[in-house]
Amino acid sequence: MSDWNPSLYLHFSAERSRPAVELLARVPLENVEYVADLGCGPGNSTALLHQRWPAARITGIDSSPAMIAEARSALPDCQFVEADIRNWQPEQALDLIFANASLQWLPDHYELFPHLVSLLNPQGVLAVQMPDNWLEPTHVLMREVAWEQNYPDRGREPLAGVHAYYDILSEAGCEVDIWRTTYYHQMPSHQAIIDWVTATGLRPWLQDLTESEQQLFLTRYHQMLEEQYPLQENGQILLAFPRLFIVARRTE
């Protein structure tokens, strides 16, 4: 897959950072020494962690060289490592693993989440936020356009679900706080919705298409978005964006 685009990702930085702020507010830790930010991207979530615990050793992990370069430039006091989350091993047990909008890209959560818990200190916390929009029109229409135009299914898998994550983490020895929130983002146009998802959810669908194929895909996608997202009285569009939050504290 082509590398991530930090500038495009940060175009909606306020909207993308808000869930990280709200997730961090629920982390029940006062003093921490070792923190990992999994899927740190350009460092917007890492900056929040550094603000709360300026003396902590914070390591951001991301598989994108471009994102890591952006994060290193923005936060010279933090450490950043280019690595696959599934294979990365910390040098010591962690007090907090923070994963804002990253783990949804990885498979096998029944194995991944217990593995992450095993990297925590006793009483350490795994804090996770994942977009839960697989059934939202933005993502349903990606699959429909791909089917119409005879492209393979390249989208991510749906999340396991609230009850499944509760059981996975409880069985891994955690106290679990889990909730789901739907944000309604005001978008000025249907093209703005495309701009949003092009930085994230649309990437796998477009990655292997030629420029002309991408244009055909996006033209049809735009048409279908217009059918599914009506304008408000003031001309804005409300984009519903559900997100799943988990704060799991290790007790065993």
Curated annotation (Swiss-Prot):
GO CC annotations on file: cytoplasm
Protein name: Trans-aconitate 2-methyltransferase
PANTHER family to which the protein is assigned, alphabetical: TRANS-ACONITATE 2-METHYLTRANSFERASE (PTHR43861:SF1), TRANS-ACONITATE 2-METHYLTRANSFERASE-RELATED (PTHR43861)
E.C. number: 2.1.1.144
GO molecular function: trans-aconitate 2-methyltransferase activity
NCBIfam families: PRK01683.1
Gene3D superfamilies assigned: S-adenosyl-L-methionine-dependent methyltransferases (1.10.150.290), Vaccinia Virus protein VP39 (3.40.50.150)
Gene name as annotated: tam
Function description: Catalyzes the S-adenosylmethionine monomethyl esterification of trans-aconitate.
Organism: Shigella flexneri
Family (UniProt): Belongs to the methyltransferase superfamily. Tam family.
Any one Gene Ontology BP term: methylation
